[in-house]
């Protein structure tokens, strides 16, 4: 059986990483049996030092895009069989845009935004023993801030970053329109890729009921909210 390695459930979504969610949902859509192992400890054995990765009877595959490609070929997945070459090209480019743009807005909203950081800190580091819990979060937060700045998103003001995220959300809302899924009535791997990012904004729940400005903005797009609910009703009834 395939083992999927991820970070684990946080904020009411099945994983804090959209890339883990993408692989998880893809396998659910494709009816591929798997088991999940979760925790940052698995970063030590990750082939590329990141999560997710899968172990398929001893074969390790890392990176969500590579994993989906491998599973599609290895298990003859036909989710995208009815898509045209043009639709597949559109899906690829939009997915890349989300991975390189909206993702970093998500990271900013959790790790840099002061109103969100205390809740993210508690979720990610709350189980650390007291000595480590006092300094590890701030060390990692500084590293994440440096990465966001190097990537480029972190060089912008909070309002500019929110506007960047909103542009992606607005574009997705326009593309989805009144359809059930992005390419019609049948879900595809592209829906898994889009949901993996959207759920991290729209489906998140904090115990205190807090919502940051990014989540509030995402929820203004009712068709995207309904899309996430549609996916969850079909594939995540255990939520």
Where are these regions (language model features)?
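GST-like fold's C-terminal all-alpha helical module
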Residues: 104-225
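C-terminal helix/juxtamembrane-tail motif
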Residues: 229-239
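Alpha-helical scaffold segments in carbohydrate-active enzymes
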Residues: 29, 93, 97, 171, ...
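GST-like domain detector, emphasizing the conserved glutathione-binding G-site
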Residues: 1-134
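Generic structural marker for isolated residues within well-ordered, non-membrane alpha-helices
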Residues: 68, 169, 228
